[in-house]
Swiss-Prot record:
The PRC barrel domain binds ribosomal protein uS19. The lineage of its organism: Bacteria, Pseudomonadati, Pseudomonadota, Betaproteobacteria, Nitrosomonadales. Binds ribosomal protein uS19. The keyword Coiled coil does not apply. Keywords: Chaperone, Cytoplasm, Ribosome biogenesis, rRNA processing. This is Ribosome maturation factor RimM. An accessory protein needed during the final step in the assembly of 30S ribosomal subunit, possibly for assembly of the head region. Essential for efficient processing of 16S rRNA. May be needed both before and after RbfA during the maturation of 16S rRNA. It has affinity for free ribosomal 30S subunits but not for 70S ribosomes. Belongs to the RimM family. Residues 118-189 form the PRC barrel domain.
């Protein structure tokens, strides 16, 4: 029985075994992280990284782990839980197994994601892009993104670290094919 949680939930009752592994060449997108066990029957609490916490509810399987240490799990059930989710993964049947997943990244197959709208990007597509300012000076590469209270920030690492708000006032053209981001940002900011 699922924990008592308000609002939406999804159950895949036909899921009794893990899904077959997708090809290793499959690209995966980190969509959240397991923050804690939830209850004593193997449920986990998940902190989504997407704007809509319910986005992860649309996927029947998740890859959980970090780096080379990842495993794919079928999602037996998932529910909204405030700004987070609680989920039951096939094969995670008690609190100890759920606790072992604490802090692990939750990823989904990139091929299962809808294409982004115009002028919207998946964070994973921005990682590694070269950041140039309007004067043609290379500031570094996008190392990661982070949320601030007001907006997302590009974390750019080069000779020094730059935290650049990912908003139209500072970010000009994003050229995924060319591997660059143009910004209105001084080298010494």
């Amino acid at each position: 029985m699922a924990p008592s949680c308000p609002t939406r939930s999804r159950v895949w009752s036909s899921r009794t075994s893990p899904p077959p592994d997708l090809a290793e060449s499959e690209a995966w997108v980190v969509m959240g992280r397991v923050s804690a066990p939830f209850g004593v029957k193997g449920w986990v609490k998940v902190q989504p990284f997407s704007e809509d916490p319910g986005t992860l509810m649309d996927f029947e399987s998740w890859r959980v782990g970090r780096g080379e240490q990842q495993a794919q799990y079928a999602v037996e059930a998932v529910q909204d839980h405030g700004k987070s989710l609680v989920a039951k993964l096939v094969g995670i049947d008690d609190r100890d197994a759920a606790f072992a997943l604490r802090g692990q990244e939750v990823s989904v197959a990139k091929s299962a994601l809808p294409p982004p709208e115009e002028n919207e990007f998946y964070w994973s597509d921005l990682i590694g892009l070269t950041v140039m300012n309007r004067e043609g000076v290379e500031l570094g590469k996008v190392d990661s993104l982070m949320e601030s209270g007001a907006h997302d920030l590009l974390v750019v690492k080069g000779r020094r670290e730059h935290l650049i708000p990912f908003v139209a006032a500072f970010v000009g053209k994003v050229d995924l094919a060319g591997g660059t981001v143009e910004v209105d940002w001084g080298e010494d900011y």
